[in-house]
Swiss-Prot record:
<keyword id="KW-0378">Hydrolase</keyword>
<keyword id="KW-0961">Cell wall biogenesis/degradation</keyword>
<keyword id="KW-0573">Peptidoglycan synthesis</keyword>
<comment type="similarity">
    <text>Belongs to the UppP family.</text>
</comment>
<dbReference type="InterPro" id="IPR003824">
    <property type="entry name" value="UppP"/>
</dbReference>
<keyword id="KW-1003">Cell membrane</keyword>
<feature type="transmembrane region" description="Helical">
    <location>
        <begin position="217"/>
        <end position="237"/>
    </location>
</feature>
<feature type="transmembrane region" description="Helical">
    <location>
        <begin position="248"/>
        <end position="268"/>
    </location>
</feature>
<dbReference type="GO" id="GO:0046677">
    <property type="term" value="P:response to antibiotic"/>
</dbReference>
<keyword id="KW-1133">Transmembrane helix</keyword>
<keyword id="KW-0133">Cell shape</keyword>
<dbReference type="GO" id="GO:0071555">
    <property type="term" value="P:cell wall organization"/>
</dbReference>
<feature type="transmembrane region" description="Helical">
    <location>
        <begin position="82"/>
        <end position="102"/>
    </location>
</feature>
<dbReference type="GO" id="GO:0050380">
    <property type="term" value="F:undecaprenyl-diphosphatase activity"/>
</dbReference>
<keyword id="KW-0046">Antibiotic resistance</keyword>
<protein>
    <recommendedName>
        <fullName>Undecaprenyl-diphosphatase</fullName>
        <ecNumber>3.6.1.27</ecNumber>
    </recommendedName>
</protein>
<feature type="transmembrane region" description="Helical">
    <location>
        <begin position="43"/>
        <end position="63"/>
    </location>
</feature>
Length: 273
């Protein structure tokens, strides 16, 4: 295994883990990072999807006690309500993804659309933060099915790379009456079925690019994603306990503008093919 490939896998794994659960778009960052590292062929695209498993497992580990309790208490009203809400929120993006993902990947999975989505998403976060929030659900257990559906519809925006799945669901949650912590935690829980389904579906469709010789590359990226995602989740929950999402909005806007400016100035040759 080429050491340069392993280094790229390590860097992309760290990028995936640090950005997956923050409202800054992991897909957008991976597309841009892959372009800079010249790691954007078909095998690389499967790799960036597969290493999401590391990030998913980080959520499962961080909330393992809660997940075990839900499984043990299936059949009770509270546990059933939580599972049903997750299923309701999962459906909109799953349906739209199956219908339009090929078209979206063909036209939008490139640096320039990502940069535009980063800036647009940042502006929307600033707008959402300036709205008055009426909290109707302090915890995920207080959520109604209607709020779950609304968050699920908001998640559909994340099909556009650069938008951010966590950003769309968290900000959507705030707009629809969830507390900051409830919005963030529901976003984390919702990531489990969404990312598992998307990862296995995409990897299965591109299984011809999977080889035993690449096991080291996939393992390196997945472990890096797991560790960095665990750090990001814990830090993010602590941060939003005392702050809003304005910092992430300005980061998105700044990063997106840098990509656009470097592209149009010719300083960086972002690929568009």
């Amino acid at each position: 295994m080429d050491w340069l490939i392993l280094l790229k896998a390590l860097l992309l794994g760290i990028v995936e883990g640090l950005t997956e659960f923050l409202p800054i778009s992991s897909t957008g960052h991976l597309i841009l990072a892959g372009d800079l590292l010249n790691f954007n062929d078909d095998k690389a695209k499967v790799f960036t999807v597969a290493i999401q498993l590391g990030a998913i497992l980080a959520v499962c580990w961080e909330y393992r006690e809660r997940l075990v309790n839900i499984i043990r208490n299936l059949g009770t009203r509270q546990a059933n309500r939580f599972v049903i809400n997750l299923f309701i929120a999962f459906l909109p993006a799953a349906i739209l993804g199956l219908l339009f993902i090929k078209t979206i990947k063909h036209y939008l999975f490139h640096p320039m659309p990502v940069a535009i989505a980063l800036v647009t998403g940042g502006i929307l976060i600033l707008w959402a933060e300036r709205r008055e929030h009426r909290i109707e659900a302090e915890t995920v257990d207080d959520m109604s099915w209607k709020q779950a559906l609304q968050v699920g519809c908001a998640q559909c925006l994340a099909l556009i790379p650069g938008t951010s799945r966590s950003g769309a669901t968290i900000i959507g949650g705030l707009l629809f009456g969830l507390s900051r912590k409830a919005a963030a935690e529901f976003s984390f829980f919702l990531a489990i079925p969404v990312m598992f389904a998307a990862t296995f579906y995409d990897v299965y469709k591109h299984r011809e690019f999977l080889y035993i010789d690449d096991l080291g590359m996939f393992a390196t990226g997945s472990v890096a994603a797991f560790i960095s995602a665990l750090i990001a989740i814990r830090g993010f929950i602590r941060y939003i306990s005392h702050h809003d999402f304005t910092l992430f909005a300005w980061y998105r806007i700044g990063f997106g503008l840098i990509v656009l400016l470097t592209a149009y100035s010719g300083l960086v040759d972002w690929s568009v093919d």
